Amino acid sequence: MRFSVGLGKEGAEERLARRGVSRRDFLKFCTAIAVTMGMGPAFAPEVARALTGSRRPSVVYLHNAECTGCSESVLRAFQPYLDELILDTISLDYHETIMAAAGDAAEAALHQAVANPDGFICIVEGAIPTADNGIYGKVANHTMLSICSDIVPKAKAVIAYGTCATFGGVQAAKPNPTGAKGLNDALKHLGVNAINLAGCPPNPYNLVGTLVYYLKNNAAPEMDEFNRPLMFFGQSVHDNCPRLKHFDAGEFAPSFESEEARKGWCLYELGCKGPSTMNNCPKIKFNQTNWPVEAGHPCIGCSEPDFWDEKSPFYES
């Protein structure tokens, strides 16, 4: 199923306008993506060109063991809404959550997209159960392990979206009876080298920024030791936290209900994992509105490997 008709170079503004997206809103969105990529507002025109170019890549979005929160994060993005822009920039040919097709028709759409002679980008959400040959997770009577083993190596670019897909997430928490693994770990024998966009949930602007980078450069961005793009994961949450001045001053909230917490004092002594967590949450926030620490909740380190085990307990008293 194709959800988009494409923007193309000709009439891009007119197509956006028909969907209720003004030129101002579009450029505001492009500026936000440019800032997320660490390029600054001056890079916004390049983002706009990438998003309205004639190349409209086919995208196959696979679901494994997950809660669909990563998809929800993308679908609830605004300025503009996803269906007003992103689905006109890519050809989303398979996504189990939002596609109209079901059953055999959905399976046919998947295989048709994979057979696209121009290739496709594969986005993977969710951990892959690997124990007992992957029998603990199936779609259409095929194990998630076998589906990913078949589809993912054929893609020209692969993005693991969310901490479950990147590092296994909660499914991989001890004792991990299903043998859940992140994509690169589960398929390392096939040479899969996915771009890891960690987070629980991940920020949709990081996904758009990655797609923009790929559309412009036909290559993956520079990544860290965990295959996370440095333009999003190059600094710790602590480095850009609005409460950093209180940390430096030794001002720590003693409890969540304290006056100090209401004044915005540092949450480190209440369990905040910001100093050991690489992510750009403070820079872009969610929907450019808010993020956990600013809302009064400690960072739980959700973009780090094995955070359910390694970062717990999430709170200190």
From Swiss-Prot:
According to its UniProt entry, the protein's GO biological process terms are:
anaerobic respiration
Origin superkingdom = Bacteria
> What cofactor is needed?
[3Fe-4S] cluster; [4Fe-4S] cluster
Q: Which InterPro entries match?
A: Cytochrome-c3_hydrogenase_C, NADH_UbQ_OxRdtase-like_20kDa, NiFe-Hase_small_C_sf, NiFe_Hase_small_N_sf, NiFe_hydrogenase_ssu, TAT_signal, TAT_signal_bac_arc
Q: How is the cofactor bound?
A: Binds 1 [3Fe-4S] cluster. Binds 2 [4Fe-4S] clusters.
Q: Which GO terms describe its cellular component?
A: [Ni-Fe] hydrogenase complex; ferredoxin hydrogenase complex; membrane; periplasmic space
PTMs per UniProt:
Predicted to be exported by the Tat system. The position of the signal peptide cleavage has not been experimentally proven.
Q: Which family does it belong to?
A: Belongs to the [NiFe]/[NiFeSe] hydrogenase small subunit family.
Q: What is this protein called?
A: Periplasmic [NiFe] hydrogenase small subunit 1
Can you name the source organism?
Answer: Nitratidesulfovibrio vulgaris (strain ATCC 29579 / DSM 644 / CCUG 34227 / NCIMB 8303 / VKM B-1760 / Hildenborough)
